């Protein structure tokens, strides 16, 4: 499940869970936070104070609700005394009833949830009021397509596919909005249709 079109939740089988947490932790800790004009920066500041305060509040709420803070947190990254910068943050031991698994965060925060069966993963993915985008990763492309078809989101990327061509529509399901941008569907969203009826 994603908010904006960046992943905010990752679902891993119980048998792969610990390895996934270690990989995510290493990736987050290697990610450089800084000013966009500086070489090496991978994540810049949050766009405004309202969004920044929301991200910090949700990180703190994740801890309060019992998720394990693997790395990151709501304090400024090392080397920053001001600005809307957020450390890349990873949570494990997240359950789908926690706020960080259910809300749009729009910040560098990743929650890792466990599942046992494919059907359970789909159920978790769909148990949200949002549905903008999602991702499916699998060594079996046909199976990945089957899972993608079960997820209620406006865009599903399979095996890292991130590039939408100009003809591919983009937009969400549920409270992530209706209507589409891009492609013919996006063009039709900008048109006004008129019917003229005469004898």
Which sequence ranges carry the predicted segments?
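Short cationic amphipathic helices and targeting signals
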Residues: 9, 45, 134-136
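Conserved C-terminal structural/oligomerization subdomain of aldehyde/semialdehyde dehydrogenase
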Residues: 78, 82-199
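Single conserved hydrophobic/aromatic residue that forms the stacking wall/gate
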Residues: 1-7, 11
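Charge-dense, low-complexity intrinsically disordered segments
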Residues: 1, 45-49, 181
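NAD(P)-dependent aldehyde/semialdehyde dehydrogenase
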Residues: 14-129
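Small-residue (primarily alanine) positions within well-ordered alpha-helices
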Residues: 6-7, 67, 125, 144
């Amino acid at each position: 499940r994603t908010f904006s079109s960046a992943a905010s939740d990752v679902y891993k089988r119980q048998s792969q869970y610990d390895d996934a947490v270690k990989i995510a932790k290493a990736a987050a800790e290697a990610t450089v936070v800084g000013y966009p004009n500086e070489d090496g920066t991978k994540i810049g500041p949050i766009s405004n104070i309202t969004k920044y305060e929301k991200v910090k509040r949700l990180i703190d709420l994740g801890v309060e609700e019992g998720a394990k803070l693997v790395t990151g947190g709501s304090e400024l990254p090392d080397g920053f005394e001001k600005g809307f910068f957020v450390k890349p943050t990873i949570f494990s031991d997240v359950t789908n009833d926690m706020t960080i698994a259910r809300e749009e965060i729009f910040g560098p925060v990743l929650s890792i949830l466990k599942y046992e069966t494919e059907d359970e993963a789909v159920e978790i993915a769909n148990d949200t009021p949002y549905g903008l985008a999602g991702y499916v990763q699998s060594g079996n492309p046909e199976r990945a397509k089957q899972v993608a078809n079960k997820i209620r989101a406006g865009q599903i990327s399979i095996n890292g596919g991130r590039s939408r061509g100009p003809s591919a529509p983009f937009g969400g399901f549920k409270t992530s909005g209706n209507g589409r941008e891009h492609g013919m569907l996006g063009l039709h969203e900008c048109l006004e249709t008129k019917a003229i009826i005469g004898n």
